[in-house]
Design a protein with these regions (language model features):
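Nucleotidyltransferase catalytic core that binds NTPs
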Residues: 1-165
Length: 165
């Protein structure tokens, strides 16, 4: 089976991520899910730890009934070396699935096939927008899978975000 790479920070895991993973599966590829900025946690832009992000992914993937693997990718802050850096952590993959133009450019330059998913509700299904809605008391629950809503409340992430702001 071919491997499809999905790279995200998952801060939090939202419906856009789920749509991306479903696209990988629809193409009959096995998802290799890479948690970017793995070393970052407890900041305004990265409130979740890598363990919490891994747990979110596992919660959602359990319902998709498929093979997948999660990898943790720390930042190196060097775009020229990023693809080779990621390749040190992840086995061979065939295709990169991403709606992020920087990710598309970096991996296309390195010779990878790129699949750009149909973007749905991009204005709402976006990590920064979701985190901002949480801190401002706006509706955000519709942008993440239900089990992630429960996890966010259980971890008291809204209070965490307010303390980080």
């Amino acid at each position: 089976m071919k491997k499809g790479l999905v790279l995200g920070r998952f801060q939090p895991f939202h419906l856009g991520h789920l749509n991306l993973i479903r696209t990988v599966l629809k193409d009959k590829n096995e998802p290799l899910i890479c948690i970017g900025s793995a070393q970052c946690a407890h900041t305004k832009d990265n409130p979740f730890t890598v363990k919490e992000r891994r747990d979110m992914i596992k919660l959602v993937m359990a319902e998709l009934n498929c093979n997948y693997t999660i990898y943790e990718i720390p930042d190196i802050n060097n775009y020229d070396k990023y693809v080779s850096h990621l390749e040190e952590f992840v086995p061979k993959f065939d295709t990169v699935y991403s709606g992020n133009t920087l990710v598309q450019r970096l991996f296309q330059t390195a010779g990878y096939e790129i699949v750009i998913p149909k973007m749905i509700n991009r204005e709402v299904w976006e990590g920064a927008t979701i985190r901002q809605a949480m801190t401002e008391g706006d509706e955000w629950e519709g942008a993440v899978p239900p089990q992630i809503v429960d996890m966010i409340y259980h971890l008291n992430v809204i209070e965490r975000l307010k303390n980080l702001a």
